[in-house]
C-alpha cells in the first residue's frame, strides 16, 4: 500500500498529480491511500479510481493530528506505519514525518528549494530542478531523484481540424507568473493585423478583473476569458494550438495534457518546457518564445497557421508524450523507486 498526504485543496498541479500517480500505481497493482483535506476539490475524481481509498479531515484537524503525530487518530497512524512508501505533496509536512525518512518521498511540485534539506527522498519533476538543488546542496543527506509526470495515452492525431479561424487555447490561474497579460497584448497585435485567430483563456484568479478591463479597453474581439471547465480535454480537442506564456512553470502538467490531445504548444523556456521539449522543441511538438514577448507569441501563432506545419507539430507533440511521459513510464519509475529503497 502506498500513502500520499497533502494539505492542498485547490485544482492544479498537486490535484492532477494525485490522479496520475493513482493511475500509474494501479498499473503496478498498488493500492493508493490518500490523506487530504475534506474539502479538497479533487476528492470526487480520486474516488472514481479503482485502487484509491480516501481519508479526509478538515484542514485544521489534519494539521493538529500531524503535529501530535496522529496519537489521537490511531487508524491514520497505522496507515503511515504500515505503508510501503509515503509521498508528501507539501514541503512543510516533512518535519512531521522525519522518523519515516527511509520510506518518505517529498514531491517537489514548485521547483523551489525550501524544506529540501532532510534525510528523506527529494523527488524532482524536472532535471533542471534537480540540478539546481545539487549545485547548491551537494553535501545534502537526502536521496535526490527525477521522476517527471505521466499522462494517459489517447488516440493518435489523424487529421487537422477544420476550423476556419485558428483556435488558440490557454488555461491557468490568473496570476502574474502565468504571463496572461502578454497573451492579451498578442491578441491586440493579431487584431491589428486582421489575422484570423480566436484565443480562449480558461481559468480564474486575482487578475481576472484587470485582464477583462484590458480586453475591453482595447476593444478586442479575438480573445475571451472563460471560467474553469470540468472537461478541458473536450476544449483541447476543439482547438488548434495551446499557448502558455508563463514566467515560471515547474513542469506544466497542462502542457502535457494539451500535447496528449494532439495540440502543438507555444511556450516560454520554463523548467517544465525545457524538460518536455529540450534543445530542439519543434521535433518534440513545441515552439519556444522569450519571456514577456507578446510579439513573439503573435509571430508563433501566425507560423502555426500553416496546415502542414501545424500537423507536423501536433504529431510530434503527441509522439513525445507517448514516448517519454506516459503513465506506463511513470509506473515503472515508481516501481523502481520502491524496489531500490526496499
Give the positions of each predicted feature.
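N-terminal strand-loop element at the rim of the active site
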Residues: 4-66, 144, 205
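A conserved mid-protein helix/loop that constitutes part of the nucleotide-sugar donor-binding site
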Residues: 12-23, 166, 170-189, 199, ...
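Donor nucleotide-sugar binding/catalytic pocket of nucleotide-sugar-dependent glycosyltransferases
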Residues: 106, 119-156
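Nucleotide-activated donor-binding/catalytic signature segment of Leloir-type glycosyltransferases, i.e.
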Residues: 212-227
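Aromatic "clamp/platform" in nucleotide-sugar-dependent glycosyltransferases that forms part
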Residues: 228, 247
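Short hydrophobic beta-strand element within catalytic cores of glycosyltransferases
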Residues: 264-267, 278
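Conserved acidic donor-binding segment of nucleotide-sugar-dependent glycosyltransferases
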Residues: 279-294, 303-308
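A short, well-ordered alpha-helix in the C-terminal region of glycosyltransferases
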Residues: 309-324, 330-336
Amino acid at each position: 500500500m502506498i500513502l500520499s498526504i497533502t494539505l492542498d485543496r485547490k485544482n492544479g498541479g498537486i490535484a492532477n498529480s494525485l490522479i496520475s500517480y493513482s493511475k500509474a500505481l494501479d498499473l503496478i497493482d498498488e493500492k493508493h491511500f490518500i490523506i487530504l483535506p475534506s474539502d479538497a476539490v479533487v476528492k470526487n475524481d480520486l474516488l472514481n479510481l479503482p485502487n484509491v481509498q480516501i481519508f479526509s479531515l478538515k484542514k485544521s484537524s489534519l494539521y493538529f493530528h500531524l503535529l501530535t503525530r496522529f496519537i489521537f487518530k490511531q487508524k491514520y497512524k497505522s496507515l503511515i506505519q504500515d505503508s510501503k512508501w509515503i509521498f508528501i505533496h507539501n514541503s512543510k509536512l516533512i518535519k512531521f514525518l522525519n522518523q519515516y525518512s527511509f520510506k518518505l518521498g517529498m514531491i517537489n511540485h514548485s521547483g523551489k528549494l525550501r524544506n529540501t534539506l532532510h534525510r528523506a527522498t527529494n523527488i524532482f519533476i524536472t532535471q533542471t530542478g534537480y540540478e539546481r538543488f545539487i549545485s547548491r546542496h551537494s553535501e545534502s543527506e537526502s536521496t535526490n531523484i527525477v521522476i517527471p509526470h505521466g499522462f494517459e495515452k489517447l488516440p493518435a492525431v489523424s487529421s487537422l481540424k477544420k476550423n476556419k479561424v485558428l483556435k488558440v487555447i490557454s488555461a491557468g490561474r490568473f496570476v502574474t507568473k502565468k504571463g496572461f497579460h502578454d497573451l492579451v497584448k498578442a491578441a491586440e497585435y493579431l487584431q491589428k493585423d486582421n489575422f484570423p485567430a480566436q484565443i480562449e483563456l480558461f481559468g480564474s484568479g486575482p487578475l481576472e478583473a484587470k485582464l477583462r478591463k484590458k480586453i475591453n479597453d482595447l476593444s478586442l474581439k479575438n480573445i475571451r476569458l472563460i471560467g474553469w471547465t470540468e472537461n478541458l480535454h473536450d476544449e483541447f480537442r476543439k482547438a488548434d494550438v495551446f499557448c502558455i506564456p508563463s514566467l515560471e512553470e515547474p513542469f506544466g502538467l497542462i502542457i502535457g495534457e494539451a500535447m496528449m490531445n494532439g495540440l502543438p504548444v507555444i511556450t516560454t523556456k520554463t523548467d517544465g518546457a525545457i524538460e518536455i521539449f529540450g534543445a530542439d522543441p519543434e521535433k518534440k511538438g513545441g515552439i519556444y518564445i522569450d519571456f514577456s514577448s507578446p510579439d513573439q507569441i503573435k509571430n508563433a501563432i501566425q507560423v502555426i497557421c500553416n496546415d502542414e506545419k501545424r500537423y507536423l507539430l501536433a504529431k510530434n507533440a503527441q509522439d513525445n508524450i507517448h514516448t517519454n511521459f506516459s503513465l506506463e513510464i511513470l509506473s515503472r519509475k515508481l516501481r523502481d523507486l520502491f524496489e531500490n529503497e526496499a
